[in-house]
């Protein structure tokens, strides 16, 4: 059984600039249907899911014919889901037509958001989430949640800093006293290797500030934190997922950053580690020369030159 999800993405660009794009993912039932790297299901996508009963491996396929720019999961849908986009441009010139393909997997910025989680994800021997990592996640989500409701609630910047410092102090003290596990109260088996939002803990530690905070501030902050908890869980879920990207372009390849080439197909192989921090970019270009046009221009140019030489020769004779 697969321990991660393997996804093959194929793109075939047609001479008219349109392109056929296909996703094919395989993995166990829990991983294949989660929201770590969801495949498109709505029109114009043709979506299909299957199960191999012999080894309990599930596969899902989604494909469509597209053109121009296609964005998967725009930023206005929140920070959680993995965003990626593809751009295929066709440019027609007098003597040739060029094609450019650009595929971008948006970087998740793990090292900047939660450095401890980044270290845990790079440690393949780690089987569970360290509680210190969980406090780091909570602090990041709290900070972002408070930032996202600034337009709704007006509180002083100094008050925000005091609240954040208070929570840091709570976690630090609990760690020093060996009670970090107790205050997080994460004992459920189905929460293993998954972050969750400790609502009661957060409500309790907002109490010292309740008199200076607007009504419903705490509840709004909790709600604003949820998408960032989802973001952390998706980041963790993407860990060890692998991808292959294959594409064909009309004409002669002039540029690519592909790992390898097989016949006319460009291949890239990578894992989620490639975009865990920075953007991962796939790019390729090709060109089709119009031989008949080039030949006509060459012949036409030669005739013009020949005619010019004849005229010059006649002028010299007349003179």
Model-inferred region functions:
Residues 106-296:
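Intrinsically disordered, low-complexity linkers and stems that provide flexible hinges
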Residues 4-62:
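Start-of-domain marker
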Residues 37-43, 76-81, 259-264, 298-303:
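Short intrinsically disordered coil segments
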Residues 12, 49-51, 85-87, 254-261:
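Short, exposed beta-strand/loop patches in secreted or surface proteins that constitute
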Residues 286-319:
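C-terminal single-pass membrane-anchor helix
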Residues 47-128:
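Long, charged all-alpha helical bundle/coiled-coil segments in cytosolic proteins
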Residues 13-19, 25-29, 64-68, 249-251, ...:
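Beta-strand elements of well-folded, non-transmembrane domains
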Residues 2-10, 311-316:
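Membrane-interface motif at the C-terminal end of an N-terminal transmembrane signal
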